Amino acid sequence: MDECILELQPAHLFLNIGTNDLNGPDYDRAAMLGRYEEIVQQIRKKLPETKLYLLAYYPVNPTVAEDSGLIECFRWRTNERIREASEGVQALTRKYGAEFLDLNKDLYDAAGNLKAEYTIEGMHLYANGYRPVMDALLPLLRKIGEEQGGKQ
């Protein structure tokens, strides 16, 4: 984290971390959020002026999984668990003066799952799945650019 984030001293930092912690029967929401909070604390300590954005977790679609290992994974990595984890991340934003970004509204199908056309196997996004995420993020990025006087 030092070389990839802290030494760069970014003015803005977007975190989308921890989704693999949602997998498996041993998932513990408090423990996962505790690890997430430790990372946020390190960032806040070393980069107090950095504008921090914490992202909601992407939804999944268990109906497109064909691999038996993935089907087992979806017993644990559910959209309900993802929503609960995202709510925990949102609570951290209030505690640490960060901003919560849910960029996922156009990723959902009518059943509340990740749209099948956006996913490889129900969990990871195809490139086209990132388009709606980027479309939701672009207004904020433009605003940041304007605030910095066009500096990137």
PLM-predicted stretches and their roles:
Residues 16-22, 41-82:
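Active-site segments of SGNH/GDSL-like serine hydrolases
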Residues 1-33, 59-61:
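Oxyanion-hole/transition-state-stabilizing segment in secreted/luminal serine hydrolases
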Residues 5, 40-45, 90-93, 145:
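N-terminal cationic-hydrophobic initiation segments that often serve targeting/anchoring roles
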Residues 59-152:
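Catalytic His-Asp segment of secreted/periplasmic serine-dependent ester chemistry enzymes
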Residues 8-13, 47-52, 96-99:
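Loop/turn elements at helix/coil->beta-strand transitions in domains of secreted/extracellular proteins
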Residues 36-41, 86:
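Generic structural signal for well-ordered alpha-helices
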Residues 26-35, 73-76, 120:
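Active-site cleft segment of glycoside hydrolase catalytic domains centered on the general acid/base Glu
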